[in-house]
From Swiss-Prot:
Record's protein name: Fructose-6-phosphate aldolase
Main localization of the protein described in the UniProt heading: cytoplasm
An annotated Gene Ontology molecular function: fructose 6-phosphate aldolase activity
One GO biological process term: fructose metabolic process
Keyword terms of this UniProt record: Carbohydrate metabolism, Cytoplasm, Lyase, Schiff base
Pfam families recorded: TAL_FSA
Record bears the keyword Transmembrane helix: no
Catalytic activity, reaction form: beta-D-fructose 6-phosphate = dihydroxyacetone + D-glyceraldehyde 3-phosphate
Gene: fsa
Length: 220
């Protein structure tokens, strides 16, 4: 199972990489733009933050296949080993096929249906990213879509992985993992919600109180 952070905040990645068992970091144009740091500056810093074994994801901006391929090559040259995110449009599928032949790994992004995700996998995407909460927001069932996509990939494109994205709660992420997803990417707030429950801190404080009352110290 692979756990990613969905952010371009270098300081937060450095802080959380010490704590969480991270496989890497995912970004998108909106995330990069929010940080107001040029993509060619922030990507090397993110790669350094996650270390040489971490995987970094960044997205193309072009709308046509040839433009996507050229941008993917630039990203790959700038950060060797990067996985290039390609929106799963008609042109995006063409780009994924071309990049597969070039040996550049891709992630099919902006996936709103199981059929769309399956096409990306069959075209050669290493990862496929269904948007869970965004599907829910449009009146659909994001978790069911992920379940269907996971089953389809297991049957017809086992070399590709579902990397579920777009979460608002830890429950959504856990449901995707229960559906068999091999990878998820979490925004910072959801990642921290997985640990930050008041009941945990309350339990620790009770342990400390009992220990201190008995032994007059908080050390072993």
């Amino acid at each position: 199972m692979e756990l990613y952070l969905d952010t371009a905040n270098v300081a937060e990645v450095e802080r959380l990489a010490r704590i969480y068992p991270l496989a890497g970091v995912t970004t998108n144009p909106s995330i990069i733009a929010a940080g107001k740091t040029p993509v060619w500056d922030v990507l090397p810093r993110l790669q350094k933050a996650i270390g040489p074994e971490g995987t970094l994801f960044a997205q193309t901006m072009s709308r046509d296949a040839l433009g996507m391929v050229e941008e993917a090559k630039r990203l790959s040259n700038a950060v060797p080993g990067i996985v290039v995110k390609i929106p799963v449009t008609a042109e995006g599928l063409a780009a994924i096929k071309m990049l597969k032949k070039e040996g550049i790994p891709t992630l099919g992004t902006a996936v709103y249906s199981a059929s769309q995700g399956l096409l990306a996998a069959l075209a050669g995407a290493k990862y496929v990213a269904p948007y869970v909460n965004r599907v829910d927001a449009q009146g659909g069932d994001g978790i069911r879509m992920v379940q269907e996509l996971q089953s389809l990939l297991e049957m017809h494109a086992p070399e590709s992985k579902v990397l579920a994205a777009s979460f608002k709660t830890p429950r959504q992420a856990l449901d995707c993992l229960l559906a068999g997803c091999e990878a998820i990417t979490l925004p910072l707030d959801v990642a921290q919600q997985m640990l930050g429950t008041p009941a945990v801190e309350s339990a620790i404080e009770k342990f400390e109180q009992d220990w201190n009352n008995a032994f007059g110290t908080l050390n072993l």
